Amino acid sequence: MAAQAQAPARDGGAQLAGPAAEADPLGRFTCPVCLEVYEKPVQVPCGHVFCSACLQECLKPKKPVCGVCRSALAPGVRAVELERQIESTETSCHGCRKNFFLSKIRAHVATCSKYQNYIMEGVKATTKDASRQPRSVPNRYTFPCPYCPEKNFDQEGLVEHCKLSHSTDTKSVVCPICASMPWGDPNYRSANFIEHLQRRHQFSYDTFVDYDVDEEDMINQVLQRSIIDQ
């Protein structure tokens, strides 16, 4: 029988537990670079896991560092157990609602017209709401802490501050990083903000996003980098 998205912890990777695991059962199968289900997962010496192709990109700088813990980055080894779990764990497509093994879901959503419509409707709804009230260009370089009066953190600084000072805070808060994005909803409150930070904001959006594109181009970008968000 195929496992559901709540199998044992991945090879050497960060493990979700309690409410966080229930809220995001696919989190431990998600690459912190591309934010999609691991493809040919590789575990690096510090214990974190990346898609093989994503790791190759991360290794290109002269002094590469792990994007999760910032330790020195080096080639890793194939995460065999995690790969086995991906082969045997099922999830459903948000578009057609059919079940697929995690190892097959990336290929499926790339060709599923219902999934693409699901993504486009979400992006259009967000951009439509944002266009109703013109706003000045948001500051995407420094952010306030949503828990306390501290402010002027860069993205990495905010992640570290919240991990050190607010790791046990269970209050639902708005993510200031997401709220500054073109598609961001300034009213959406994250149920588990610390876990959200660790999974979604270990890498800067500036690396992947062109903030000046129009709506159609933005939709195409989202489709290409669509996140499987259960």
Curated annotation (Swiss-Prot):
Gene Ontology MF, one: zinc ion binding
Zinc finger C2HC RNF-type: from-to: 93-112
Zn finger residue spans: RING-type: 31-70
Record field: catalytic activity: S-ubiquitinyl-[E2 ubiquitin-conjugating enzyme]-L-cysteine + [acceptor protein]-L-lysine = [E2 ubiquitin-conjugating enzyme]-L-cysteine + N(6)-ubiquitinyl-[acceptor protein]-L-lysine
Annotated keywords: Acetylation, Cytoplasm, Developmental protein, Differentiation, Metal-binding, Nucleus, Spermatogenesis, Transferase, Ubl conjugation, Ubl conjugation pathway, Zinc, Zinc-finger
Modified residues (N6-acetyllysine): 104, 114
UniProt subunit comment: Interacts with XAF1, the interaction increases XAF1 stability and proapoptotic effects, and may regulate IFN signaling.
Identification of the protein by name: E3 ubiquitin-protein ligase RNF114
Gene name as annotated: RNF114
